[in-house]
Amino acid sequence: MKLGINTLLFLFMVTVESFGANPTWSTSIANIIYSNCSSCHRYGGIAPFSLMNYDEVVAKKNSVLEAVTTRSMPPYPADTKFRSYSHQRNLSDSDINAFVEWVNNGAPAGDLASAPNPPTFSSGPIIKNPNFTAEMPFYASQAKAGGEDEYRCFVLDGSPTKDEFISAIEVIPGNPEIVHHVLVFQDTSSIPLQLDAQTSEPGYPGFGGVGSNTAELIGVYAPGGEPYFFPKGFGLRFRKGARIIVQVHYPAGTEGQMDFTSVRFNYSDAVSPREVFIDPLLNHQNIVNKPFRIPAGQEKTFTQRMTIPIDATAFAVMPHMHLIGKSTKIILRMPNNDTIPIINIPHWDFHWQMAYTFKTLQKVPKGSILESTVIYDNTSENPHNPSSPPKEVRVGEGTTDEMMLTYFYYCQYQSGDELITTEVQDDSPIDMPLTDITFMQIQDGVIVKFPGQIAVHSLRIYDVLGGIVHDQQSNHRHQHSSLTIPISISGTYFMHAIDADGKQYTGRFSIMR
């Protein structure tokens, strides 16, 4: 394979910059912090201190060092070596090693004049002209310092007059400093209103759910999260007459602080939107080793299996357990007995629940089997156990009860679904049409051809499972009209690149050996 001199120089600089010794704030640490920490660690964010500039990070460098080396921060419970996901917030081994080396070397600043600018965060909603909006009433958190977190459900005003299809959903925390996470449901029954009427304050308590068997999960918010955009042409049914219920998590120590969280929806403009469903396909009915009981003082492992009755397409996965959940691992067993990783959460944290979106849509063939292995720890050694001493635990929505559910976002499969990427959302500034980028296979890889000279800031290649097979970053402004990427394994791949001006480029290609 012949490489142009510019390409060789570019790859050399990327290698030196990414893996060279003596990282500084300006060359690498700032990008790591801004990309993974600052969305929460900023003034007005939910984190307890800001990490928005060199001085702030140096002042907290030891705390940050402990958090990143123990992988307690950023909070992203899924094992991304098992499978990677869109918009994931976790540090690579090289990121962690760079931060450790930076601290050990005295946290050098480098050339601050060349350091990247801090990120800017919108103070308002991203969905500017929603088709539907609803707000909860003003509410003062009752979560006392040193006490328990509060989980409260609110029934929001407003309902659609006919069935609509939601193409985008945004949760806007009224007080980002106290809203830990939000689950969004719709319900056509009157049960949530009845529960709401039983309390004098706005809303009603709800730890494990919203108290209605007919409520349907439609959205999730966690700190630093962005609106959820379904790929074009897809939508989630918003039922005529349905009310929106939000379950809001307020951490202990927020007592007396006010919140007024709201939600915004955009509706699909497709003539016939493809309907997306969110259902707990793995649930208490398909537990293999029933009954679902966890004896006091024991760890217990359960397995679920579900045979898929149709060809389906999966967008995202969201496991759900309560406080004695320890771990969950899910695979897809194909009809030919091959296995595909879906999700692995080795250390379950009830307080950090989220939906994990596949980087490319996952085909789930008819006859394949979803299979989970879930462990519960009902011992006194579990610091999250709500009962002391431990008591037998069964299914239920209460604090001392448990659940074993995994929600999937899915639809009926159509040919080509597995080529649809979710890495770039509909509101992202995709400046170059897909046809403007071409790919040419060569003996040892592929040549990516851009329509003109661009300064590549970052370029990643993903496989069909969302795994990163090539990653290069650069702070230099060297211009390229093409880049050569070494890839030796046959398959379909997806490219996402960003130039020095923030323009984004996407494309897909196949390698045949």
Question: In which residue ranges do the predicted regions lie?
Answer:
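Bacterial Sec-dependent N-terminal signal peptides
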Residues: 1-24, 483
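Aromatic- and Gly/Pro-enriched helix-to-coil junctions and flexible linker segments
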Residues: 20-154, 246-247
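Solvent-exposed strand-loop boundary residues in beta-sheet-rich modules
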Residues: 43, 188, 334-336, 465, ...
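A mature extracytoplasmic/lumenal domain signature
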Residues: 55, 250, 374-376, 452, ...
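Beta-strand-centric surfaces of beta-sandwich/beta-rich domains
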Residues: 73-85, 114-313, 318-419
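Low-complexity, Pro/Thr/Ser/Gly/Ala-rich linker/spacer regions in secreted
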Residues: 415-431
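C-terminal outer-membrane/trafficking sorting elements
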Residues: 431-513
